[in-house]
Each structure stands twice: as C-alpha cells, then as structure tokens.
A protein has these predicted regions:
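AlphaC helix of the protein kinase catalytic domain
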Residues: 7-16
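Activation segment signature within eukaryotic-like protein kinase domains
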Residues: 24-25
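Catalytic-loop of the protein kinase fold
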Residues: 36-52
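Activation segment/activation loop of eukaryotic-type protein kinase catalytic domains
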Residues: 53-86
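Conserved C-terminal C-lobe helix
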Residues: 143-156
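A conserved short helix/loop substructure at the end of the activation segment
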Residues: 155-168
Length: 176
C-alpha cells in the first residue's frame, strides 16, 4: 500500500475544524497504543511519519522502532535517536551525555518518550508549529483548557511527571 500523503502536507493544505483535529489526534494515539500493546517503541514520531491511507491515519517509518526489553543498535551513548526538533528530553540527554558528567540523567528511550513526541505532534496538529522548551498556557490558543492540560502533561520534560500510558491520553481525548 502507498500512502496518499503525510500529516505535515495534509495540515498545510487543508483547513480542518478543531473537532476533526481532536479526532485526528485520537486516531494517531490509537495507532501508538497498538505499537505499545505488541511491545514496540516508535522513537521517531513526527508529522512526516504520520501517513494517510484512504481515510485512515497510520504511523509509518518504523526504521528506529525498538522492541521493549531488547538491546537495540541505536541505544548507545551519543547516538542520535529520532528526529531533530521532535526528540524527547531523554533522547537529547542520551545524545549529549559525556563520561565525565557528574550528573546522571534518565536517558532510557521508552514508551514515555513516544508519549512526549506524540504530544509534540498533537501540538503541531492543533497549533501549526512545534513546541519549543517548556510550554505555557499563553503559548496555546484561547479556550480549550482541557486539551491544553493533556498536552502539558504529555510534554513534561520530566519523564516521572508524564503519562505512563497512552491509555490515559486516549481516555482524555475521548472526553473532549
């Protein structure tokens, strides 16, 4: 099967109502849940890797996918794992860490890393840009505090303060 396009081009060329954007986020979240449920981390989520097949959105480009609890060739220190601008904080820490750094950072790339990247993709879907740094309420368009709260949780720079499961994200999106 060939994709008819990617999310980036779709959003650039279509005016999509807010409710449809939430549905799009939910469809992508369910795709990530499917990967998680069979034991995989994607690690390369970005708009260019969300592909449309007929009227269905699917997560593509599985080149950096990793099976949970298995060593992966891309998990060495200083390896750049994932797309620039869409990396989770732990992926960036892994890339930048040095042997003589007395501070130890959580550099495990896992499902919560995918949740962070997915939060960036959702922000892009809703705002038309990628969030940079710590997000603030004033960075987000007026109204829709419910979705902002979900995004802020997903985009927390501390993995310990991020959703531990994509199920939480799906449940919250379903209520909007």
């Amino acid at each position: 099967d060939y994709a008819s396009g990617d999310l980036k081009n779709y959003l650039e060329n279509n005016d999509i109502p807010f409710g449809n954007r939430i549905d799009l986020c939910l469809q992508i979240a369910n795709g990530l849940k499917e990967l998680k449920d069979i034991g995989y981390y994607h690690r390369d989520l970005k708009p260019d890797n969300i592909l449309m097949f007929d009227d269905t959105w699917k997560i593509g480009d599985l080149g950096l996918i990793a099976f949970r609890d298995k060593d992966n060739i891309y998990d060495k220190k200083n390896d750049f794992i994932g797309p620039k601008g869409w990396l989770s904080p732990e992926a960036m820490n892994k890339y930048l860490q040095s042997d003589n750094n007395k501070y130890k950072f959580d550099c495990n790339i896992d499902h919560q890393s995918d949740v962070f990247q997915l939060g960036k993709v959702f922000w892009y879907i809703l705002q038309g840009n990628a969030p940079i740094g710590n997000i603030r309420r004033s960075d987000f368009f007026d109204g829709h505090d419910d979705i902002y709260s979900v995004l802020k949780y997903m985009l927390n720079h501390s993995k310990k303060k991020r959703p531990i499961s994509i199920d939480y994200v799906i449940n919250e999106l379903s209520r909007i």
